[in-house]
Amino acid sequence: MIKVIELFAGVGGFRVGLNKAKGYEIVWSNQWEPTTKSQPASDIYTARFGSDNHSNEDIAEVIEHKFDSIPDHDLLVGGFPCQDYSVAWKREYESTLKNTSGIKGTKGILWWSIHAILEGKGVDSPDYLMLENVDRLLKFPTTQRGRDFAIILSSLTDLGYIVEWRVINAADFGMPQRRKRVYIMAYKSGSPIYKHINNLPNIEDWITTNGVMQKPFPMRINNGNLLNTQLSFDNQEMERFEIKGSLENLYEDKTTFTPTNRPFKNVGIIKNKTVITYDALPEYYGDIMSLGDVLQDEEDIPPEFYITPSDMESWIYLKGAKNEGRTTKTGIDYHYSEGAVTFPDALDKPSRTIITGEGGRAPSRFKHVIEVSPGKYRRLTPIELERLNMFDDNHTQEAADTKRAFLMGNALVVGVVEKLGKSLHNEHYFYME
């Protein structure tokens, strides 16, 4: 069994996916919401999986005062918040493990908590990492695009990892929701997979042909030619460069990282500070799930999910295109325009991305609305939102409906983790032999 710790666990998406993949044992988990007294995500996590080896404490406090409570493990997983990756945070973290300086951002310290665990474990640090984040991580911050991701990659290579990443839209691979996220896999020096990659004559073969991510999520280079699946440095679309300098220098670098440059494409790998990266398109020819596939029977839908005729005008306005004059609260006139969004949502395609504001009766531009019969409309239920993320029904049943929607807006698509988990497990044991 591959032993796992799950950080920033939420309601347990990584755990559900790895349980479905089989061959993994979650030996410790942490979920802490610093901004509220109530801890609904952690409560749901323990309701599903039990409270043994689960921590509902500030991870910084755990690392500072209870580091030995974090067991040794083979795989660290987590969907860390995408906020501020300032190296000053790292210095602050190393000195106090707390944010007391007021440096911009409130959750950037959470990346450095992963780093602190890897450093603290030393020779016993995990062989593998599986991380998830919003895809715009590759382009943060807007004034120095790619800087934050470079800091993450550089800090991991300093700890002896080969790192690959891939932007995966779940719907591109048959799943029922269009949810685009960057997934990061890292392999430590000495691990079976690291040894294999390190011995490859051409490291790009790992991300183009037979790697942990390419096998379950095959992609081809995006060069406008549907017939061209060959990848090499002869193709101008594949880029190679070095990440140079200390973490502090990377943070201040405004030459490499500019408002217009985009150094990191949606597929890539880094070894010893050398990056190979390219933009790619999905290559999937299997079955596709749609929004219509996850709907409950109408007789099971509570009445409050149906849209009343009196609210329909507001829904239509918010969903529609706008090209109008508006006035601010201070009396300043301005022009406002935006395009229409699909209304109602198509049932024969994967859904739009679930957002945290999905719950509640109030009309909204972004909530999903379906037409269940001519002229009869409703919102999606918590169970349907769970199904769009490929959780089991009622995974979040301990929370109120609006909070359940919020939690699903923060969750990942379990099917992605399941496929990555199966691939990692297979490759680990194959190369171990």
Residue ranges with predicted function:
Residues 2-125, 134-147:
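Core alpha/beta nucleotide-donor-binding catalytic domains of modification enzymes
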Residues 113-128, 155-160, 391:
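A structural motif corresponding to the C-terminal end of an alpha-helix
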Residues 254-433:
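C-terminal target-recognition/interaction regions appended to catalytic cores
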Residues 144-164:
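Conserved Class I S-adenosyl-L-methionine
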Residues 175-262:
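Flexible, glycine-/basic-rich loop-and-beta segments that form/coincide
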Residues 152, 164, 178-182, 350:
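Residues that flank catalytic or metal-binding motifs in active/ligand-binding sites
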Residues 67-69, 174-177:
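Short glycine-biased active-site loop of nucleotidyltransferases that positions the nucleotide triphosphate
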Residues 56-57, 135, 161-172:
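Conserved S-adenosyl-L-methionine
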